[in-house]
């Protein structure tokens, strides 16, 4: 049976749970202070006066990718490709379906005056990459989840080929080379999606930080880490042109560069801190709510906010964000665990059935040959 248990606790990095919350907090600031969901073609922004600061909150997503690179490298260690895939699927999919469905129902029942949703859209979103089926994401924030899934698929393939993490240096050099070739010359949309060419540097930083965390110390590691951080910073600055056209914002590349370097430096430093002066249950709760909070904060948050008042202010926005945090905690505390258990049981039974069918099929062939 594939190994899908959580990795043992002693080597947890508790401060990463706090950094996850900080990254999600930056994204929430971005969506409530600079760029919210569109209602009938009009962009909703609860507190536009925060825009000069809030506009840089988009960097919370790529910083989260760096944290994900570290966590996924740790999660993959000692697992089979199938075990890793089941563990990742059971981690992200049940919570996604719960939060996406809550967002859909709230929009359908309460937010229909501001936002349009359909059952077809809900059905397409069950596959996460809804635009592949001609439907929009249920929540505009879901685009980053697709990138995460692509990253998981690559890691599972590398595990199957036996080159992860053994050939991590080669993987990262090739990945960064493809990134720059596509970003500077080819500009092929398929390559951008397939190789995560807009965010590869951040994932690479996380993977290399994990190498350092495992005890590796050599010149090549530090050189690659510098290259990956430079790539990540380049990618963040490179996004500004498109982001400026899309949002009509005015971004300072120097500010983006500084935020990237400092944020990635903090992630690196965090892995050297073994404990924090906070209750372990609180730290685990903080880490646990970040995923459902990210999935719920935007569309569902604005549905609640606009139902309260057509002209949001700081107080109403704070109340809504607090309510979404509580809802995220409820999802994590009471719904996520049972849903994950059901998914793991179902996937493991399906995997066992497939293996048994293949075994019987090969057994039949062997007898036929004899």
Regions found by a protein language model. Name each.
Residues 17, 21-24, 61, 68, ...:
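Residues within membrane-spanning alpha-helices of integral membrane proteins
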Residues 35-59, 67, 75, 86, ...:
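Membrane-interface helix-loop-helix regions
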Residues 21, 28, 97, 101, ...:
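Residue-level signature of the transmembrane alpha-helical core
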Residues 2-6, 365-370:
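Short, charged juxtamembrane terminal tails flanking transmembrane helices
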Residues 2-15, 25, 29-53, 74-78, ...:
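Alpha-helical transmembrane segments in multi-pass integral membrane proteins
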